[in-house]
Amino acid sequence: MSTIKAANVQNTGSGAPTFKNSSGTEIGQLAKAWVNFNGRNTPSIRDSFNVSSITDLGTGKYKITFTNALANVNYAIAGSAAELGSTGFNDVFFGAGRNNNYSDLMTTTFCTVTTSTSSHVDRDIIMAIIFGD
């Protein structure tokens, strides 16, 4: 077993580094973007990677804008949402949607937060992560 200690890891090509097993088969990638934000009132980003802004599109509906565009629109997005306080609601998250301009999805994505009864809601804690090229 070896341990690698480095300040930076860089692909020899133009893409992100990939993780491979001893046979050379790819077994993983790094996230292309992630965000943790407050979805109440005017959305505010707590922390993020490759996310420049969150836009409120109505109750429980948000647009996530990437700092650097993704290579294509074939990415996967996952997330969760929660409410602070005594109620402790944990909600069904994530309807990833799209707008009418398919090419915009390389620079933005859309998400919704809904309850188990399909009502759109704003929540204090909303988190999303994006994997793909």
Give residue ranges: language-model regions.
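Intrinsic disorder/low-complexity segments
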Residues: 8, 80-82, 97
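Extracellular jelly-roll beta-sandwich "head" domains, especially the C-terminal globular C1q domain
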Residues: 85-133
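Extracellular receptor-binding modules and their adjoining Ser/Thr/Gly/Asp/Asn-rich linkers
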Residues: 2-72, 116-133
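Short, surface-exposed, low-complexity cationic segments
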Residues: 69-82
